[in-house]
Amino acid sequence: MILNAKFLISASKIDEAPQPIYTEIAFLGRSNVGKSSLINTLCKNKNLAKSSSTPGKTQLINFFEVDCKKDEDKFKLIFIDLPGFGYAKVSKKTKAIWNKNLDEFLKERSSIKLFIHLIDSRHENLDIDLNLDLYLDSFIRADQKKITVFTKADKLNQSQKAKLLNANKNAILVSNLKKSGIDKLEQKIILESLGFNEE
């Protein structure tokens, strides 16, 4: 389980990132999908990661040190809140630099062991998410894994939820508002981080 967490540092590129010490978990998805809010819910601290209703607000790579426990063992993880893909009120030049820095960070940061791809459950097949999935698959290593998480589950009815999960067998459906699916995701993160595999 996650005990608590604290903000470490913000970085705009890999050179500014802290030296990797612990296993890292990267949260990524399109803008305004709820990455910061999910990190806050998982860490039981609504003020930890700064979330905003304005798409593209998170323009830096933010690192959080997370204290965890499984049985009697305590350990630390690093959660990484990444800038949202696909939307930002910035110039084309700034966006190009930003995308280059993100690409370099994701491909070269070998301490990232788990990618959590967040998708708005109401819009499951957008090109940006399909492309992000293909992008991750293009470089993900044998010692890395990917979890698909559908957010904003409270916006769906029961039949919509069932249909979504039926089409995406290994995905997890969460709602920050209702706190549903959070425990399941938390357990999955802990197990994967420790090298366990539930399947």
From Swiss-Prot:
Gene Ontology molecular function: GTP binding; metal ion binding
Cofactor requirement: Mg(2+)
Domain EngB-type G span(s) in chain numbering: 21-195
Gene Ontology biological process terms, A to Z: division septum assembly
Gene Ontology cellular component annotations, sorted alphabetically: cytosol
Residues the entry annotates as binding Mg(2+): 36, 58
Entry keywords, A to Z: Cell cycle, Cell division, GTP-binding, Magnesium, Metal-binding, Nucleotide-binding, Septation
Residues that hold GTP according to the record: 29-36, 56-60, 81-84, 151-154, 174-176
Function comment: Necessary for normal cell division and for the maintenance of normal septation.
PANTHER family named in the record: ENGB-TYPE G DOMAIN-CONTAINING PROTEIN, MSS1/TRME-RELATED GTP-BINDING PROTEIN
NCBIfam families xref list: GTPase_YsxC
Family listed: Belongs to the TRAFAC class TrmE-Era-EngA-EngB-Septin-like GTPase superfamily. EngB GTPase family.
Record's protein name: Probable GTP-binding protein EngB
Gene: engB
